Amino acid sequence: METYETSIGTQSYPPTLFPPPLGTGGFTTSGYIHALVDSTSNSNSNSNSNSNTNSNTNSNSDTKIPIVQISDDSHITHDSFKPYMEYHDASHLRNRNISKADQVDSTEVMEQFTQWSNYKMRSRSPTINAKPIRHTSQRRTDFTSKNELSKFSKNHNFIFHKGFLKRQHSIRREDRQAKVRSRFRSKKELTSVLNYIELEQMDIANVLASQSVNLHAIRNLTSRDPAVTPIPFLRSQMYATSSRPPYLRNRSIRRKLPKSQPGSLPTTTPATATKTIKQNSTTPTTRSVYNKNVGRSNTSPSVLYHPKRRGKLNTKSHARKEQLLLELWREYLMLVITQRTQLRLTLLCSPGSASNESSVCSSNASDLDMSLLSTPSSLFQMAGETKSNPIIIPDSQDDSILSSDPF
């Protein structure tokens, strides 16, 4: 049997079993368990072990088992725990401020500087919940008799109704606006021209007159519903001449055409293409996607292209894009307000300012604490102003420091 000394006496345990942790075996208290290990406790344990002659005194005196004290106090009064408690309180307060800053809505801070609620209400478009646009049906009376129809059908002729020519004109106009008019009628013509072009001898100024190229139109063509994305600029200096062989150069220029998706712009061959090119071309012809959803009568033109888009307004996509714009604008305004406030506090707490001797500025917090955003009034109290008279830094003036003393 092995003996272990605790604050309540000596307890014995079988050698095959491990003893419970010190200060926890058989105790059910609601207070704190403090293991105070110092020179006094070690000396007391050594004196108690030397007085006991029936047990192994030498082993107990060498191991220096600490004395466990159980206190029911709500706070720690020992001097050795003061640095730990100060660090624990500081970290707990910092974590609480950070969690509050994450949960606090920045609307109160925005209202102190701007009229965000009024702007948000005015920015809502009244046409979001409007009814879908309806096109009135233009019914035309067909005065063709049955005798005329039977006469022309025998000769395999077609009677053009009143709105046929107007509809064909609108189709050609929409087709010209939708597709990009190229100089080449097919891919073979483009490939044949590229085979005779030396990119190393070509002057880039003849192709790109400006210093930058706007890719906004290309992004709108590639995406069906373009979101709020920044417009990149492609510098003309990035087009460097390559020193690769011609066969590799021609292969790198070729690009695969994207697959046609329903709702996207169709890739139709122009009507001026010759018959020889159509016979020799090996690329499969893409069918037009407009014939699937177009529903019109035989005598009246209806919505020709994209009937779903023209017939009604997509309220969900419009609201989503508008919400994204509002969030981006709100984030930008919040960053500007925070930076201006931090700049003002830095100027007030600078060595050359008169408010440097205040208790708030004398602290070690150099950066703007996120907990200040939860209480907007504290921003003005730190700056020495009131809520009715906030600090305003106009954009026309310079934000530079007029003081001669450096930071």
From Swiss-Prot:
<protein>
    <recommendedName>
        <fullName>Protein NIS1</fullName>
    </recommendedName>
</protein>
<feature type="modified residue" description="Phosphoserine">
    <location>
        <position position="300"/>
    </location>
</feature>
<feature type="modified residue" description="Phosphoserine">
    <location>
        <position position="264"/>
    </location>
</feature>
<comment type="subunit">
    <text>Interacts with CBF2, GIS1, NAP1, PRM8, REI1, SHS1 and SMT3.</text>
</comment>
<feature type="compositionally biased region" description="Low complexity">
    <location>
        <begin position="266"/>
        <end position="276"/>
    </location>
</feature>
<feature type="modified residue" description="Phosphoserine">
    <location>
        <position position="302"/>
    </location>
</feature>
<feature type="compositionally biased region" description="Low complexity">
    <location>
        <begin position="40"/>
        <end position="61"/>
    </location>
</feature>
<keyword id="KW-0597">Phosphoprotein</keyword>
<dbReference type="GO" id="GO:0005935">
    <property type="term" value="C:cellular bud neck"/>
</dbReference>
<keyword id="KW-0963">Cytoplasm</keyword>
<feature type="region of interest" description="Disordered">
    <location>
        <begin position="251"/>
        <end position="315"/>
    </location>
</feature>
<feature type="compositionally biased region" description="Basic residues">
    <location>
        <begin position="306"/>
        <end position="315"/>
    </location>
</feature>
<feature type="modified residue" description="Phosphoserine">
    <location>
        <position position="260"/>
    </location>
</feature>
<comment type="function">
    <text>May be involved in a mitotic signaling network. Binds sumoylated proteins and may stabilize SUMO chains.</text>
</comment>
<feature type="region of interest" description="Disordered">
    <location>
        <begin position="40"/>
        <end position="64"/>
    </location>
</feature>
<feature type="short sequence motif" description="SUMO-binding">
    <location>
        <begin position="391"/>
        <end position="398"/>
    </location>
</feature>
<feature type="compositionally biased region" description="Polar residues">
    <location>
        <begin position="277"/>
        <end position="302"/>
    </location>
</feature>
<dbReference type="GO" id="GO:0005938">
    <property type="term" value="C:cell cortex"/>
</dbReference>
